[in-house]
């Protein structure tokens, strides 16, 4: 009888263990999300601490399938050369270029990071992921022309923007972008700026190559089709992350990690809330999707080589800035025009309709309500966008490409972006356009929230994660020396340091096979 009872007990224990969470040995770093942010941070950490064990968890069957995918973003190497929303005009008429300078400095860091990876053969064939495409601003109407002229003049005080061309001459602008000028109403007041060193970037390709290089290391493990289901802090300040294997009957595995990075794009908010850290209190998200008109007609594509950005309508949010872009996606040239806003309660393109309602908590419902009241213009904009017909979209395109033909263009759905809503002492809650790193006080978990300028600033944003989460390590001579190898200008500003600007751009441009135009002293 005792033997029978013992056998039954053993069978019971074995049966329970099959259904219980399988536990694995601890890792140094767990990266949640298989996009460019996680890939960049993983690459940094592998180079700084080659002996550290790193795991990456991605819900889909491939990396770089959400916001990093070439079709899910505009592919602009954001340098503030053409994006008019990065400069603002004060009430006294002065032009504030501080944000434009910061954006440009950040992209120069990203270029250095990528150039270093080319040197190390981590990234291969720069033409597969970055190409020169001139960045242009194009406006019409007296007020907009006056704004662009003033913006151009203000930017010339920064060495980073020296060499930007400005013209109000229709013939000159036609040489730059013939499709924008052909069929345009004669006598229309127009102006344009042009920066030849602008770039088009395939962030998905960068991500795939970075992860591919990491995957060749014994210290790295990639888990595809795994979804994080739970995130709990342990008494020793490590984290136990429970995930389900979606390709294996949702079998659950737990991983213990010293440091967790939540780089899951639109999915980051829910995971941050799951962590329960007090720093996450009060954050909420508002999802906004986008679509573009696209053409691959070679007769059209070959006649446009530029990213042409316009000026957003009064009252419209920053993400509404229209642009006509030359793109290189998967080695093929494409023209895209947009974006046109779409709305879904999903936080990810491959997410759930319950993402938005499921993210509402007692701690963030107040900020969400207050942000909604204060952003009535955004609500009106979204409603207007959702009511657009294909004829309406083509009419918008013809403001930039007057002779565009309906049959050449089709609507493609891009990715989802989750804009940050956070507590505000004065307003109760504010909608914030940008990115923000949220880190636990002990640095054991960090999350990236928000969208624009996004992937263009992956390298500097992940540097800020290192500085917050590994403060003591960053201060060591060893990490300082390595960071200055990876990003030669690390710790210094390029703006108005002509020698440093020229040497840095020349170094990265040579490796990335980009044109380099030396900066000249201010006239």
Curated annotation (Swiss-Prot):
A Gene Ontology molecular function term of the record: L-malate dehydrogenase (quinone) activity
Pathway the protein contributes to: Carbohydrate metabolism; tricarboxylic acid cycle; oxaloacetate from (S)-malate (quinone route): step 1/1
Cofactor or coenzyme needed: FAD
Catalyzed reactions per annotation: (S)-malate + a quinone = a quinol + oxaloacetate
Coiled-coil region list: none
GO cellular component terms, A-Z: cytoplasm
InterPro entries to which the protein is assigned, alphabetical: FAD/NAD-bd_sf, MQO
Entries under NCBIfam families matching the protein: mal_quin_oxido, PRK05257.1-1, PRK05257.1-4, PRK05257.2-1, PRK05257.2-4, PRK05257.2-5, PRK05257.3-2, PRK05257.3-3
Record's protein name: Probable malate:quinone oxidoreductase 1
Underlying gene: mqo1
